[in-house]
Each structure stands twice: as C-alpha cells, then as structure tokens.
Amino acid sequence: MHHRTGDCRSWQTFNGLATGEARCGFFGKIVIAPDAQRTEAFQENHNILLSDTARVNSKPRLEIYADDVKCSHGATVGKLNEDEQFYMRSRGIPEEEAKVLQMISFVAPVLETIPEDATDGDLSRPAIAELVESAIRSFA
C-alpha cells in the first residue's frame, strides 16, 4: 500500500492457517509519502499453525516519510486455543468440530470485510465463505 496524498485511510488484515508441511510468508509494506500528511494506516497479520511442521514468516513493514500520521502494524503466530477447545468439548462438541469452529471464527472477520452484495462472477461473500469452510473441513 502506497499512500501518496494526505488524509488517506487504510486497514489491512491478513489471517492465515498453515497445516502439514506448509511454508507461508507475509511480507507487507505500507509507504507513507512526504505529502501524505494526516494519513491513518494499519496493517496486521495473524496466523495459526495447525501442525508442528508448518512454518510462517511474517514481516509487516512501515516506511513513513511524513510526520503527521497515525500508523501501526503487528503480527502474531500461534496455535489453536486449547481452553476454547476444552470449553466446546465439555458442551458435547466433538474435538474435530471444535477445531473447525475455531478456524472458521478466526477467518470470519476477514470475510466480513467483503461487502454483502459484492459479486465478481461467482465470488459473492456467501460463496467465498462456503469455499473457505469447505477448505477448512478438508484439512481439519
């Protein structure tokens, strides 16, 4: 993302799930040009490792050449929350379904940024959500 003029706003959220022998990389960069005063820019990358052999390399970057801006970035890499799994299992949800629900809830905030009525061919928000859930269930 390159902000070249003032009073810009951007919010980037990237959530990733890595399983098996996956090697994932996130190399984000936001540039704020000298004339882009009063810009607000945020970048975040969150990842969940679903196996002991999956790896994620996350490098968010900010290049700021203006002095009146509000910018931040962040990255996390972790595993599924065992306390949440225990809670769901204690209420009768099978372990695999609990993991699926955790993964779906992890990616849901990103899916919700797609406008409800957005369509690009067959890629409406419900169609994308269905594809994501199907993919999650295939490797859970």
What are these regions (language model features)?
Residues M1-A140:
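Active-site gating/interface segments in enzymes
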